[in-house]
Amino acid sequence: FSPNSPSDVARCLNGALDVGCGTFACLENSTCDTDGMHDI
């Protein structure tokens, strides 16, 4: 993930919680939000 954009990481983590995705997905810079939405 990009350590130079902590705000983006924070938003990603918040989004991960909303879609029930693991925080590790955000840290690995995956399409957690998209996959989570499709799962739901």
Swiss-Prot record:
Compartmental location: Secreted
Molecular function, one GO term: hormone activity
TM spans (from-to): none
Glycosylation sites: N29
Tagged with keyword Kinase: no
Domain of life per record: Eukaryota
Keyword Calcium applies: yes
Organs and tissues of expression: Produced and secreted by the corpuscles of Stannius.
Keywords annotated in UniProt: Calcium, Calcium transport, Disulfide bond, Glycoprotein, Hormone, Ion transport, Secreted, Transport
Pfam family, one: Stanniocalcin
Signal peptide: none
GO cellular component, one term: extracellular space
Gene Ontology annotations of biological process type: calcium ion transport
Recorded family membership: Belongs to the stanniocalcin family.
Record note on quaternary structure: Homodimer; disulfide-linked.
Biological role: Its primary function is the prevention of hypercalcemia. Upon release into the circulation, it lowers calcium transport by the gills, thereby reducing its rate of influx from the environment into the extracellular compartment. STC also stimulates phosphate reabsorption by renal proximal tubules. The consequence of this action is increased levels of plasma phosphate, which combines with excess calcium and promotes its disposal into bone and scales.
Protein name as it appears in the record: Stanniocalcin
Taxonomic source organism: Oncorhynchus nerka
Name of the gene: stc
